[in-house]
Structures are given as structure tokens and as C-alpha cells.
From Swiss-Prot:
Residue ranges annotated for the Helicase C-terminal domain, each copy included: 357-525
Protein name, as recorded: ATP-dependent RNA helicase SUV3L, mitochondrial
Protein keywords: ATP-binding, Glycoprotein, Helicase, Hydrolase, Mitochondrion, Mitochondrion nucleoid, Nucleotide-binding, Nucleus, Transit peptide
Entry keyword annotation includes Glycosyltransferase: no
Biased composition (Basic and acidic residues): 62-76, 695-709
Disordered, as annotated region: 58-88, 667-734
Transit peptide (first-last residue): 1-60
Composition-biased stretches (Polar residues): 725-734
Organism of derivation: Oryza sativa subsp. japonica
Localization annotation: Nucleus; Mitochondrion matrix; Mitochondrion matrix, Mitochondrion nucleoid
E.C. no: 3.6.4.13
Protein family according to the UniProt entry: Belongs to the helicase family.
Enzyme class: hydrolase
Family matches, as CDD domains: DEXQc_Suv3, SF2_C_suv3
Length: 734
């Protein structure tokens, strides 16, 4: 905090100087300069090879006297009062080069760039200002001070330079700082708890239900929700909101449903089940339940959970999830003045790791198994192989399926009076569905992240594995294992790890904040405006700005359309569209174009004649449902007159979901992709594996489907840095 205080003092002196008559540039710096500058031990004891920096401190016998460390104020005083060296430098060439190298590293240090925001220096401008500082400092620096700087660890040296850098900017760049001031003030995302004055006027009771899957935490919160006079349930998924809506109404409690695509207002209801983005922070409630609270740290959607925690007008707020964001919730409650209670939960029955894997052969699948694969292609390959080489029938669940189809597949799997006794699913199975799973089998523990194959995060492995076993089902005991023996060690390693503590949670500006910022840049496109906002926004150490890649891609596509207001563009960019699906993007562009021309937006999409006969037709059904879902979402976010075919879209959506369910029941074809094939593996071996999977007809044998190469094993060479739990805390079965 010494650096923060020094910068504050620098700004205050300059702003009150009678010579400059500058208006105050001072910010609440302590909120922005969170990281205290590391301090050297006192008294200062230089390293042995720099023992004799200061000739005045060296005695005739060669003993050095302790000298207090140079601080930022002394450094600035020295360089600001000395003239730049002319002719021969006052520093030896080696020392000069080392100081310049240090200043280059200072200009590339993200921590210094973050702290420079307190001076109204945006991240994009920091390298330029740091370069000017680099040209200014070395010629004025004494040998003693230079050697002192070079003797320090990098972080300490940067912290010592920061106050001098601040003084330099305020002295020499004040006019430029003033230009940045109004821009950065409009992009100020600090102290977000102050955005909700009505919530701050309340002293809320926050109850954190902390525990793993299958521990009863959400059940207890929902019991309190149903018993309250009024309440809201905030879900991460439309599917989960629909499930709570059905259950609560079945209990005789009137409850409405609000999702982006569907709004059902039940007469006389004081309860509502909604998706987290559809939460109203204007309505008062007695009880609110926010599910999967750990999603606050999600890099894309985390802002919605943060908004709920900060803005809910509820006397009682129940947060359900794992402990990863508990520390941050404590800090937020301290900022908001709310009371926090923590209720700890354990699984009803421990999750057991089955040491005997499937040994790379899907013939070892058993009833009640859920095979988890991390790509649509693998899901259908596994389903095809299981149904070809065993007596089992498979249900399928993955993210691109409509919620209605996923519910139908889950119901089919849960029922005991049919032949569908195996589930093949993606990570979408990790939340939102109650499933009678006996054993979770990881087909792979590596996934494609859009660039390369990476290990599945330990937290995600825990979430998915925890779906095995459910209280009250025919499989109360949960088992988990892997398809390949080589993957088992990584599974065990993930389950042993404690939950990783989140460092920050997400924020994203509301439309009013973007609108206020846009006044500063009337000539920028919306895409450029988003870039400029991110570049200039300031957040404190508890928060981060959520990623906006999908929003920016949509914004870029819509730039060619004339006649859209800023708010129109903002809303269209949040529409639920799969940016990797060209057909879905085309329809969004068409919707926006028609809207901009004040024309009624048509669906312009025919109803399929029947269920899919191949994977191309199945993909087309998925896309059609996504387009209809997007149409319904837009109808709730724009005036109804512009989207008049809501009833038709709802009917088509239901019919297509039914066709998808019928298509999945008879799916027995080789999977394809929405786009042309892209390289998805890191080495030739993996490519060979994928080719082998594609050519099932060539590789099928009486021995069944096999994949003998582990995709996680190469990553196992790198040990995870986080400490593991005692292995005795895990349960194993042969």
C-alpha cells in the first residue's frame, strides 16, 4: 500500500500546486492499488556482490554500514532535480543496459499496468507511457540508486519504480491524463455493490449451502423457497428452471416461469423460477435461491451470478454450490453489510472409484452406466458401438439438444420398464438433470478447447463424477471409473484435489453503462466500442471483466446493418446463438436486418417432414430448433409487434424437439460436423485414432469397439501444483 499512498500523494500535490492550477485527478487509489508493494527487510542488507554500493558508507577497513533502502519518493526526488547526463553517461554501460532492461520489464508487467489504471492510464497506453519513463530515467539516475534497483528482486524493483513513474506521469503528462479521465470514469466498474441502492438499504441474510453433488444442499434451499410467502429460484439452465417450475406447482405452490425463450405467468403466483440472466433485481422477495453459485467465477457467464448476489432484493438469499467462491462471497457480504451463514454438506454416500476400468472395450458396459465423452462425434461413435456389440440401448444427452429433448432422454433412461439402460452424454450431464446413474465412466479425460486437446479441469471431473448415485433411486451408491486404464490415475488425482479457490468473479457492464461510455466515442462501431470499454474499464481485485468473444463476433457481423440503435445492437449481441453454426448466424443476421427496416420478422423456415435419416438431417433439426429458440428470445427482448409469430415458433419448437427424440432413438449413422473438418489432435497418433473411429465399418470386429490410446496420459507427466487430499479419503473397489 506504500506505492498506492505515494501515487495518491503525487496526484494530490500536483492537483493543488499553485504553479500548475490543475484540477484534482485523485482517485480512491487504495481500491485500485490492491497489491501492497513488497518491502525489503529493515535494516537493508544488500546482497554480498553489491555490498559496497555507497562509497560514503565504506570504512577504511572495508566494513559497510547499514543504509536504509531507497524508496520511491527519494528516487523521484533524485531524478527530478538532476540534469540529464551529457556526453559520457554517469552510469557504466553494463549498468545502463541493465537499468534499461529493468524498465522494459516494468513496462510489460501486467500488475504495474493494472495499478496504473489509478492514474487514468488505460492498459493500451501504459506501454507508451512506460517507454517515455524509460527514456527519462536512466540519464538522471545515480550509480548508487541504479545498483540498488538492480539488487532487488523484480517485483520489489517494480514496486519501487511505481511511485516515481506516477510522479513522472503527473508532472510531464498531466494533460494527457486529463483526456483519459472522463473516458475511464465512464468505464468504472469498481465498487459494483453500490450499483444496487435498494438492495443496500436492506440487511439481507445470506445462507451458503456448501457441498458436493448428491448432498441435499439444493433440496434444503428449495424447501425453504416453497415455504416462503414469495420467492425466486435462479437457475443456470432453462432445463433446471423448468424442472423447479413443475415441482413447485405440483406441491400446490403457484409458481411462474421466466426464461429467455419462455414466459409462463401463473395467476396469483408469488414465486418464480427463472434462468439467472432473466432475474429481476427490481422485484422484492422473501426468499431467493441462486443455484450453482460457483458459476460466479465462470469467464463468460459469471457476471449474471455476481449481479444476483449483489442486486437481489430478498430478505433471505440461499446460495447453493461448491466452496470455490465462499471466500469471495464472504468479502462481498462484508462490503454489502449482509449477514452470512455457511451450511456444510457431505454426500449422502461416498463416491467410490472403481479400480477395474472398462479396459478400452465397450463390451464391458453395464446397465446404469453413463459414458461421458467430450465431443458430439465421440458420443455417437460410442452409442453406435454399444448398440452394435452389446444388448444395451443408449439414451443421448449433449448441449446442442433442446431442453425438452434432454428431459425426454433423461426420463427414458430413468424408467426401468424399457430397454434403454445406458446413457451416453457430454459434460451437459454435470448439472440440470436428476438421473439414475449407477456408474460414471469417462470415455476420455481430455477435451478440445477450440485450439488443442487439454485435460478436463478437476472441478468439472468432480461435478460429472458426482452425478453417480442418487438418494432415493435404485442406485444410491455412486461409482466412477474410466474407459482406459491409463486414464484412471488422472481421475483419482482430480477427485483427491480440494476445490480450487476462485480468485475473482465476473462482471459485465449493463446497457446503461455502455450507453454512458458510448457518448465519449460517437464515431466508433459497436464492436470497437466494446474493445475500447474493456481497454479502459477498471475493476477492483475481487472482480474480472467477463469474456466477450461471442458478443464481439455477433457485433462484427451486425456492423453492416444500418438503422439499429445502440440498445438494439446490445440486445441482438446477447441473443442465444451458436456462433460456430453458419446457418444460425445467417438467421440472426436476417432477423436483425428485418428489424432494422421496421419490418415484421418472419421465421422463414419450413417444418421438417419427419425424423432424421442421417446425421446431416439431425444437425439440421438441431439448428432449426436453435433458430426458433433465438426467435422466441428476441420476441421477449424487443417489441412484440416486430416478432409476431411467437405461437407458430413455439409449436414448431415443440414438434422439432419431438422429432429429435425420435431421431435419437434410431440413430445408427456415422457422425458429421457442422463445419468442414478441422485438425483436432495434437499428434499423428491422435489423428490415427480419430480416423479409426470414423471408419467403423473397417475396424468392427467380434471383439467390440476399442480405443487403446489415452489422450490424458501425455498431460500426466506434469504434476498438478495444488495439494491433494489424503488418498485414504477416497473409496476404491476392485
Amino acid at each position: 500500500m506504500a506505492a498506492a499512498a505515494a501515487i495518491a500523494a503525487a496526484l494530490l500535490r500536483r492537483s493543488t500546486s499553485s504553479q500548475h492550477h490543475r484540477r484534482i485527478l485523485l482517485l480512491p487509489l487504495l481500491s485500485h492499488l490492491q497489491r501492497a508493494a513488497p518491502r525489503s527487510p529493515s535494516p537493508w542488507d544488500p546482497p554480498p556482490h553489491h555490498r559496497f554500493f555507497f562509497s560514503s558508507d565504506v570504512t577504511a577497513e572495508g566494513d559497510s554500514k547499514p543504509r536504509p533502502p531507497l524508496d520511491g519518493k527519494q528516487l523521484w526526488r533524485e531524478v527530478s532535480t538532476s540534469e540529464p547526463a551529457t556526453g559520457a553517461s554517469r552510469l557504466p554501460k553494463a549498468t545502463w543496459d541493465a537499468v534499461v532492461a529493468l524498465l522494459r520489464r516494468f513496462g510489460k508487467d501486467p500488475a504495474m499496468s493494472d495499478q496504473a489504471l489509478a492514474l487514468y492510464i488505460p492498459a493500451s497506453a501504459f506501454p507508451t507511457y512506460a517507454r517515455r519513463f524509460r527514456h527519462f530515467l536512466p540519464a538522471r539516475l545515480s550509480l548508487e540508486s541504479a545498483e540498488h534497483l538492480l539488487s532487488l528482486p523484480a517485483d520489489d524493483a517494480h514496486a519501487l519504480l511505481l511511485p516515481a513513474f506516477a510522479e513522472f506521469c503527473v508532472t510531464h503528462l498531466a494533460d494527457e491524463l486529463r483526456k483519459h479521465e472522463s473516458v475511464m470514469a465512464a468505464a468504472d466498474l469498481t465498487a459494483p455493490h453500490a450499483w444496487y441502492p435498494f438492495a443496500r438499504a436492506m440487511r439481507r441474510r445470506v445462507v451458503y449451502h456448501c457441498g458436493p453433488t448428491n448432498s441435499g444442499k439444493t433440496h434444503n434451499a428449495l424447501t425453504r423457497f416453497a415455504a416462503a410467502k414469495s420467492g425466486v429460484y435462479c437457475s443456470p439452465l432453462r432445463l433446471l428452471a423448468m424442472e423447479v417450475f413443475d415441482k413447485v406447482n405440483a406441491l400446490g405452490v403457484y409458481c411462474s416461469l421466466r426464461t429467455g425463450q419462455e414466459i409462463k405467468e401463473v395467476p396469483f403466483s408469488n414465486h418464480v423460477a427463472c434462468t439467472i440472466e432473466m432475474l429481476s433485481t427490481e422485484e422484492p422477495y422473501e426468499v431467493a435461491v441462486v443455484d450453482e453459485i460457483q458459476m460466479m467465477a465462470d469467464p463468460v457467464r459469471g457476471y449474471a451470478w455476481t449481479r444476483a448476489v449483489l442486486g437481489l432484493k430478498a430478505d433471505e438469499i440461499h446460495l447453493c454450490g461448491d466452496p470455490s467462491v465462499l471466500k469471495i462471497v464472504r468479502k462481498i457480504c462484508a462490503d454489502t453489510g449482509d449477514d452470512l451463514e455457511v451450511h456444510q454438506y457431505e454426500r449422502f454416500k461416498p463416491l467410490v472409484v472403481e479400480a477395474k476400468t472398462l479396459l478400452g472395450d465397450l463390451k464391458n458396459v453395464r446397465s446404469g452406466d453413463c459414458i461421458v465423452a467430450f465431443s458430439r462425434r465421440e458420443i455417437f461413435e460410442v452409442k453406435l458401438a454399444i448398440e452394435k456389440f452389446t444388448k444395451h440401448k443408449c439414451c443421448v444427452i449433449y448441449g446442442a439438444l433442446p431442453p425438452e429433448t434432454r428431459r425426454q432422454q433423461a426420463k427414458l433412461f430413468n424408467e426401468q420398464d424399457n430397454e434403454y439402460d445406458v446413457l451416453v452424454a457430454s459434460d451437459a450431464v454435470g448439472m440440470g438433470l436428476n438421473l439414475n446413474i449407477r456408474r460414471v465412466v469417462f470415455y476420455s479425460l481430455a477435451k478440445y478447447n477450440g485450439d488443442r486437446m487439454v485435460p478436463v479441469a478437476a472441478s468439472q471431473v468432480k461435478q460429472i463424477a458426482g452425478r453417480a448415485g442418487r438418494r432415493g433411486s435404485i442406485y444410491p451408491d455412486g461409482l466412477t471409473t474410466t474407459f482406459l486404464l491409463d486414464d484412471l490415475d488422472y481421475l483419482i488425482q482430480c477427485l483427491q484435489q480440494p476445490f480450487e479457490e476462485a480468485k475473482k468473479v465476473g462482471l459485465f457492464p449493463c446497457f446503461e453503462q455502455v450507453e454512458s461510455f458510448a457518448i465519449q466515442f460517437p464515431d466508433l462501431t459497436f464492436n470497437e466500442l466494446l474493445d475500447k470499454f474493456r481497454e479502459n474499464c477498471r475493476v477492483d481485485s475481487t472482480y474480472f471483466m467477463c469474456h466477450q468473444e461471442s458478443i464481439k463476433k455477433v457485433a462484427n457481423m451486425l456492423e453492416r446493418i444500418q438503422g439499429l440503435s445502440l440498445k438494439d445492437r446490445y440486445n441482438f449481441c446477447f441473443a442465444p446463438v451458436n456462433i460456430r453454426d453458419p446457418k444460425a448466424m445467417y438467421h440472426l443476421l436476417r432477423f436483425a436486418t428485418n428489424y432494422s427496416q421496421s419490418r415484421r420478422v418472419s421465421i422463414a423456415m419450413g417444418m421438417p417432414k419427419g425424423s432424421a435419416k442421417n446425421d446431416t438431417e439431425l444437425l439440421d433439426l438441431e439448428t432449426k430448433h436453435q433458430v426458433l429458440s433465438m426467435y422466441l428470445w428476441l420476441s421477449h427482448h424487443f417489441e412484440e409487434d416486430h416478432f409476431p409469430h411467437v405461437q407458430k415458433a413455439e409449436e414448431m419448437s415443440i414438434n422439432i424437439a419431438d422429432l429429435l427424440a425420435k431421431s435419437l432413438a434410431k440413430a445408427s449413422w456415422k457422425p458429421t460436423s457442422r463445419q468442414q473438418a478441422k485438425p483436432r489432435r495434437e499428434n499423428e497418433e491422435d489423428n490415427d485414432v480419430e480416423q479409426a473411429s470414423d471408419d467403423n465399418a473397417k475396424n468392427d470386429s467380434e471383439d467390440g469397439y476399442e480405443r487403446s490410446i489415452s489422450r490424458i496420459k501425455p498431460f500426466m507427466r506434469k504434476r498438478l501444483d495444488r495439494p491433494s487430499q489424503d488418498p485414504s479419503s477416497l473409496n476404491f473397489v476392485a
